[in-house]
């Protein structure tokens, strides 16, 4: 059953516990330690309840959308986040450690909109405590439809000496 509570993002649902060694219990023999028999080992993830599913929802008011593009930028969402806007699947990200973004413009309408994110941490998917939930900031970025894409902009040094440098700049509009 779901238990809804009001939280602020960033948020990690596992931090509040309850702590229990079952969350990271292994029965193994550590060969490097010379162990011949398997025994219980725990503690690699701090006994935090990071395995499971979590859901986040919020509302977003949008004014005149003409000429605008709306992007959600996630700095960290553990794990396997699926993003919904007004009940429509807007996107999925298969990894929890790297940032990602989604263009949600096609799913929005002027007025009140509902954003939802579901996350799922699988058993045995981490060797350490990975986090659980929207553990880093989430940003709504509004830009003109015609604009420089900050995630597709690259600057590199082609040549440099003590007197001058030549730089190359690549971007997408």
Model-derived regions: residue spans:
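Short, P/G- and charge-enriched loop/turn segments at secondary-structure junctions
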Residues: 41-48, 156-157
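Contiguous beta-strand segments within globular domains
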Residues: 157-172
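Beta-propeller folds
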Residues: 2, 7, 61, 169-170
């Amino acid at each position: 059953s779901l238990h809804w509570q009001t939280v602020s993002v960033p948020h990690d649902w596992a931090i509040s516990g309850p702590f229990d060694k079952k969350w990271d219990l292994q029965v193994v023999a550590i060969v490097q330690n010379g162990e011949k028999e398997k025994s219980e080992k725990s503690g690699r993830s701090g006994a935090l309840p990071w395995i499971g599913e979590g859901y986040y929802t919020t509302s977003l008011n949008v004014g005149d959308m003409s000429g605008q593009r709306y992007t959600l930028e996630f700095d960290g969402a553990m794990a396997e986040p699926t993003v919904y806007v007004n009940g429509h699947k807007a996107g999925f990200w298969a990894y929890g450690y790297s940032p990602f973004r989604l263009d949600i413009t096609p799913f929005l309408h002027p007025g009140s909109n509902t954003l939802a994110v579901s996350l799922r941490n699988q058993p045995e998917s981490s060797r350490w405590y990975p986090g659980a939930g929207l553990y880093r900031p989430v940003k709504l970025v509004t830009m003109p439809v015609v604009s420089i894409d900050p995630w597709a902009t690259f600057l590199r040094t082609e040549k440099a000496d003590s007197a001058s440098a030549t730089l190359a700049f690549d971007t997408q509009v």
